[in-house]
Amino acid sequence: MDTIENLIIAIVKPLISQPDALTIKIEDTPEFLEYHLNLDQSDVGRVIGRKGRTISAIRTIVYSVPTEYKKVRIVIDEK
């Protein structure tokens, strides 16, 4: 696991009710390094938060981690 993936897990796992259902798939696109968070449907609202404030805060923290050559993007998927 890389640093960004560990950071995402450390932030998201305490927020959700079913942490065992959390999986992260990394997709390398030409412009971005995308981290797809697969969550249980009941946990999606917790991670997004009211008016998107929680996911916005998570993205701010994750985007502050320096990467070598690509921008990082977080995508939330439902199971």
UniProtKB/Swiss-Prot annotation:
Stored Pfam families: KH_KhpA-B
GO process annotations (BP): cell wall organization; peptidoglycan biosynthetic process; regulation of cell shape
Gene Ontology molecular function: RNA binding
UniProt keyword terms in alphabetical order: Cell shape, Cell wall biogenesis/degradation, Cytoplasm, RNA-binding
UniProt-annotated location(s): Cytoplasm
Entry-linked PROSITE patterns: KH_TYPE_1
Gene3D superfamilies listed in its UniProt record: 3.30.300.20
Disulfide bonds: none
Disruption phenotype: Cells grow more slowly, are rounder with less elongation, form short chains.
Entry's Gene Ontology cellular component terms: cytoplasm
Residue span(s) of domain KH: 32-79
Family the entry assigns: Belongs to the KhpA RNA-binding protein family.
HAMAP family for this protein: KhpA (MF_00088)
PANTHER family, per database record: RNA-BINDING PROTEIN KHPA, UPF0109 PROTEIN SCO5592
Assembly, per entry: Self-associates, makes at least homodimers. Interacts with KhpB (also called EloR) via the KH domain of KhpB. The complex with KhpB is critical for regulating elongasome activity and for KhpA localization at midcell.
UniProt function note: A probable RNA chaperone. Forms a complex with KhpB which binds to cellular RNA and controls its expression. Plays a role in peptidoglycan (PG) homeostasis and cell length regulation. The KhpA-KhpB complex stimulates or controls elongasome-mediated lateral cell wall biosynthesis. It is not clear what is the function of the KhpA homooligomer in vivo.
Protein name as catalogued: RNA-binding protein KhpA
Provenance organism: Streptococcus pneumoniae (strain ATCC BAA-255 / R6)
